[in-house]
Amino acid sequence: MNHDSRTYPFKFSIITAVYNVASYLSGAVESILCQDIGFKESVELILVDDGSTDSSGEICDHYQALYPYNIKVLHKPNGGAASARNAGIALASGKYLNFLDGDDKLSPNTLSAVYNFFSTVDDQISLVSVPIQFFEKKENAHRLNYKYRDGKDQIIDLNVQYSYVQMSIASSFIKHNVLNDHSFDTSLRYAEDAKVIMQLLLDHPYYGIVPSGCYYYRFRNTQNSALNGTKLHREWYLDCLKNYLQWALHSARQKYGKIPFFVQYNVMYDLQSRFGVPEIPESVLTTAEHLEFRTLLKELLQSIDDKIILEQKNLSREQKDYIISFK
């Protein structure tokens, strides 16, 4: 990988897209202030207020007044998480970037653990991830945390460990100089973060894992676990499939002449939840759109080997058989 010889004033820039999270934002910020790597010496926090209508913007300004050297605040009209993150990247001056959500937290040792690992393998990878732990309404570990079960910092070779999916940008730490060549797709309401990560991994199918760090993902008490809000939006069924999953398969085929297993596994992991929706309301998809959705599913599945479907870790044998027959 290209060596980055530039000097950065901060080890990390934490970029947070802020939208109506007044009840939680202080917790997110405080989790950065208390990082044992040393906030004042090592960390820049960029708070992008994306047109909040509650007091989130004022909370951003409050913290900037307390730490004017370390905290930058940008107030902008609402444009979505992708546009807010892109705006934050333009302001960043840290060597490594992270995209903490405004209602989540990092464990106090996360930045030091990630930095220490990067310092030993900096020329080999551009991305490091940490485990995700849910809190508030749910308190279990993320289903992809099996990647960290060995408990060791290590480099993942996706050519071999193709089931070690990484989709969350919030639990990722990425080299600034590498991310400069990419941006978040503002046409996507969902999976804009996964698309950026896929771009990076298509270029270089290796990344690091640091099991001792932790990203705390707030599963809010107001969320309905039976029918997640994403399943009530047209974009999750159509735009995400066309502008992320189809794009991923096409890009992989163009680059490699085939679709590597790690791309197939990633796409199938993302697709599987679409088969768990009992009935899509007409208020979400029209009859024509529902037909388009089913056609897209079939087209995507044509590019996925049965082997990859059968190796999914969160589907029953009956579900796997159904998906294979659906092809």
Where is each model-derived feature located?
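Catalytic core of nucleotide-sugar-dependent glycosyltransferases
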Residues: 216-221, 227-256, 280, 285-306
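Terminal low-complexity segments of carbohydrate-biosynthetic enzymes
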Residues: 256-260, 267-327
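Nucleotide-sugar donor-binding/catalytic module of glycosyltransferases
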Residues: 1-247
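Hydrophobic/aromatic-lined pockets within catalytic cores
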Residues: 119, 205, 249, 253, ...
